[in-house]
A protein has these predicted regions:
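Conserved active-site and SAM-binding loop architecture
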Residues: 1-195
Length: 195
């Protein structure tokens, strides 16, 4: 996986050397930084050491390439997002500004998914990050009604990925992006469907 990211990156920089970007949004894979992985210790040969090594050997190099891409293209604005509970924050300069947001405050998907968004460059100074205090309208019995996997809470799902459909886990609310960029609300953002 790491090799393909590096090769793809090399191709981008060779073909877009003169391009000017207003915005770069980067969402590096979160699985190697996930704190949920610790629940696998003792299963299928996973150890604390093997999980840490995977993060250092796969996760951190992808994060560094992501940062290198942002540095190379020097966009007017950039965002780097990952789950707030993950360990990626341990590998990002603590002086880089960030927002913490909850997706349930920006969409009707029914799950919280607290997300950290680091940012740089020109920002919307009117942006106010929204965090859920169980006031989003998607809470029953003091819990959000859906898992990030797209399955109702209390129902069985196969792993964190919800089976073969990982799209719910990786989607980003278009309203959040619109607010971050201070864009008017529109359905035509050229983004993947929110549903």
């Amino acid at each position: 996986m790491r090799q393909s990211v590096v090769m793809y990156y090399s191709g981008i920089t060779n073909s877009l050397r003169l391009a000017v970007f207003d915005v770069i949004w980067a969402s590096p894979p979160c699985e190697t930084f996930s704190t949920v992985r610790r629940s696998n210790i003792g299963r299928n040969g996973y150890t604390k050491e093997s999980i840490y090594a995977d993060m250092i050997e796969r996760g951190v190099p992808i994060l560094r390439k992501t940062q290198e891409i942002i540095d190379y293209f020097q966009p007017k604005t950039w965002f780097l997002e990952n789950p707030q509970t993950g360990l990626m924050k341990n590998y990002i300069d603590p002086f880089i500004s960030f927002y913490d947001v909850d997706y349930c405050k920006y969409t009707d998907w029914g799950y919280r998914k607290r997300t950290r968004i680091w940012y740089g460059g020109v920002q919307n100074e009117n942006f106010i990050p929204r965090l859920c205090e169980k006031d989003c309208g998607f809470v029953e019995n003091n819990r959000h009604v859906m898992h990030v996997t797209g399955t109702p809470k209390g129902k069985s799902s196969k792993g964190q990925g919800g089976g073969n459909n990982r799209a719910p886990r990786y989607r980003i609310p278009s309203v959040l992006i619109q607010e971050l960029l201070s864009l008017p609300y529109t359905e035509d953002l050229c983004l993947p469907s929110d549903t």
